[in-house]
Design a protein with these regions (language model features):
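Active-site loop segments of alpha/beta catalytic cores
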Residues: 1-26, 80-216
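Helix-coil boundary/capping segments in enzymes
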Residues: 17, 27-95, 102
Length: 216
């Protein structure tokens, strides 16, 4: 049973010979990771502006950083937001030949967050207020990210990917960041579009989310 079969059987609860694992390359892995590069979800490693116009400051050894200047402070500037071109050919050069390089490993392709990226653009407090005060505008912004994911899914499927993963941290230590009702109204239908498109293209879907998310 090869790596791809192990992962697939694990996802489907079909009694794999062992659990698949994902360690640094020198220790071995059943997964092969790929993704568009540069990604609209990238953060500048040493601080500075990202493709959306958000200004990042990094601290210490971590390259995660935090946004210090948000590009969309006022919804009246929405039409002037710098939106990365998801179709730019250079983004997709890295996935060419991924199937051949991966061998029998399970190819896991990286997507674009539809919550974290929103608050990187608007600010976290603004995003929370938008849920109640500007839901239509907020929905328009989330939809831009959804459409990017739909494009990525087709590109990855054509390149032979097996799974699609992206990250949105929804949880605090003991509760969600937003009310479950609001999450179901604004984000759940949009996640459904992404997952349905991925499944239709033959990809498994994975959503990483830190924190307490039991309520959804």
């Amino acid at each position: 049973m090869n790596s791809s079969e192990l992962v697939t059987r694990t996802i489907r609860f079909q009694n794999p010979e062992r659990l698949p694992y994902d360690f640094p390359e020198k220790y071995g892995s059943d997964f092969y990771s790929t993704g568009l590069s540069p990604s609209p979800d990238d953060r500048p490693r040493n601080g500075g502006y990202d493709e959306w116009g958000a200004f990042w400051q990094t601290f210490g050894f971590s390259n995660l950083g935090e946004v210090k200047e948000y590009p969309l402070k006022d919804w009246k500037d929405f039409d002037h937001l710098s939106v990365p071109d998801i179709h730019a050919p250079q983004r997709w050069q890295g996935i060419e030949g991924a199937r051949e390089r991966a061998g029998d490993k399970f190819i896991l392709a990286g997507g674009i967050s539809i919550y974290e990226r929103v608050h990187f653009i608007r600010g976290l407090e603004n995003t929370w207020m938008d849920i109640y005060q500007n839901p239509e505008e907020l929905g328009r912004l989330v939809d831009i990210l959804v459409e990017m994911n739909l494009v990525a899914i087709q590109k990855y499927a054509a390149a032979g990917a097996d799974g699609y993963i992206f990250c949105d941290d929804w949880g605090l230590q003991n509760r969600l960041m937003v009310a479950p009702k609001s999450w179901r109204a604004l984000w759940k239908p949009r996640y459904a579009r992404i997952f349905q498109a991925a499944h239709a293209a033959g990809l498994f879907t994975f959503l990483h989310s830190c924190g307490y998310i039991v309520d959804i």
